[in-house]
Curated annotation (Swiss-Prot):
Its EC number is 2.7.7.6. DNA-dependent RNA polymerase (RNAP) catalyzes the transcription of DNA into RNA using the four ribonucleoside triphosphates as substrates. It catalyses: RNA(n) + a ribonucleoside 5'-triphosphate = RNA(n+1) + diphosphate. It is an enzyme of class 2 (transferase). Keywords: Cytoplasm, DNA-directed RNA polymerase, Nucleotidyltransferase, Transcription, Transferase. Its main location: cytoplasm. It comes from Sulfolobus acidocaldarius (strain ATCC 33909 / DSM 639 / JCM 8929 / NBRC 15157 / NCIMB 11770). This is DNA-directed RNA polymerase subunit Rpo7. One of its GO terms (molecular function) is DNA-directed RNA polymerase activity. GO terms for cellular component: cytoplasm; DNA-directed RNA polymerase complex. Belongs to the eukaryotic RPB7/RPC8 RNA polymerase subunit family. One of its GO terms (biological process) is DNA-templated transcription. Forms 2 domains with an elongated structure; Rpo4 packs into the hinge region between the 2 domains. The gene is rpo7. The lineage of its organism: Archaea, Thermoproteota, Thermoprotei, Sulfolobales, Sulfolobaceae.
Length: 183
């Protein structure tokens, strides 16, 4: 789920930025500090939308920079359990497929793709169903549900997905299900 999060903090503005807009410099520094990083219990910071820094700062003895209180908005992505996502298969391995969900990739374990037994064809980089002959490969559009997310600071979240429930899976399979149900 994407959301805007308002935060408060202190931003250090080095002397080379003195004389410039405090808000613009604060945004630049906050982007360097937070963008594309994971903040525990908040999510992956995709961008700093705006910032309002106090015009008056304070200094610390021995440091030429000024420190300003700042309030800013971050666009973040937080994976939510049972959230249904659509994405593109970015990688296929013998243990499952990785789905690009935008800011992060999620893993669909081979046991969570379909009820059919899947075999990995390493020459073509494709998973093929033994009975159904359904296949999934890099570039396929899929719909999946988040079943777990492990978020620890400093690295991107590990997200487990499933495609076994009705109307989840490769978009082509879903369209076939809908066509069969409407007959």
């Amino acid at each position: 789920m994407f959301k805007l999060v308002r935060a408060k903090g202190i931003v250090r503005i080095p002397p080379e930025y003195f004389g410039q807009s405090v808000d613009e410099i604060a945004i630049k520094i906050l982007r360097q500090e937070y963008q594309e990083k994971l903040i525990k219990d908040i999510g992956v910071v995709l961008g700093i939308v705006n910032a309002k820094a106090s015009e008056e700062g304070f200094i610390i003895f021995g440091d030429g920079a000024t420190y300003h209180e700042v309030e800013f908005d971050m666009l973040v992505y937080t994976p939510i359990i049972h959230e249904v996502i659509e994405g593109e298969v970015s990688q296929v391995d013998n243990y499952g497929v990785y789905v690009n969900m935008g800011p992060v990739d999620g893993l669909v374990h081979i046991s969570q793709i379909t009820d059919d037994n899947l075999k990995f064809d390493s020459n073509r980089g494709i998973l093929i169903g033994e009975k159904s002959k359904k296949s999934i490969q890099k570039g396929d559009r899929v719909r999946a549900m988040i079943i777990s997310a492990s978020m620890s600071s400093g690295r991107l979240p590990r997200i487990a997905l499933t495609m076994k429930q009705p109307y989840l899976g490769k978009i082509e399979w879903i369209n076939q299900e809908i066509a069969k149900a409407s007959k």
